Regions:
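Acidic catalytic/metal-coordinating carboxylates
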Residues: 39-43, 65-70
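Alpha4 helix (beta4-alpha4-beta5 surface) of REC/receiver domains from two-component response regulators
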Residues: 69, 90-107, 114, 118-121
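Receiver (REC) domain active-site loop signature in two-component systems and cognate sites
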Residues: 62
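Non-catalytic signal-transmission and effector/linker regions of two-component phosphorelay proteins
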Residues: 1-10, 114-129
């Protein structure tokens, strides 16, 4: 899927590693999206409560609030809000008995830009694509 294959979106990227946030922001900005970043779940939730985002992309393990906790808090406010998780722990989480509540797509780190584009296309509601 090419960058022009879907509309441009407002995306919130959450990761405690600034380099990861910057890399994902650069990839998504290259595709024309408007991207904001946060470095923990609590800061992300505060941003989410102030602004409207078409998509939230979050890491799993972060200080203050994990990504699954952030997703649950977001879905409690807006059940239709798409949330994608990017994590180095994808295989462990998928094998776990505990379901990832509120996660619409899971991407394993490291990942390719194409994986991210596909997750965006899959998770956004049809009327937005």
């Amino acid at each position: 899927m090419t960058a022009d294959a879907y509309p441009k979106r407002r995306i919130l990227v959450v990761d405690d590693e600034p380099l990861v946030c910057d890399a994902v922001k650069m990839m998504l900005t290259f595709d024309g999206h408007v991207v904001q970043t946060a470095h923990n779940g609590a800061d992300a939730l505060a941003l989410f409560n102030k602004e409207k985002f078409d998509l939230v992309i979050t890491d799993f393990l972060m200080p203050v609030m994990r990504g699954d906790q952030l997703a649950a808090a977001i879905k409690a406010q807006n059940p239709k809000q798409p949330v994608v998780m990017i994590t180095a722990h994808a295989e462990t989480l998928q094998a776990s008995q505990t379901p990832l509540t509120g996660i619409d797509a899971l991407i394993s780190k490291p990942f390719l830009l194409e994986n991210l584009r596909e997750a965006i296309a899959r998770t956004l509601p049809v009327e937005q694509v």
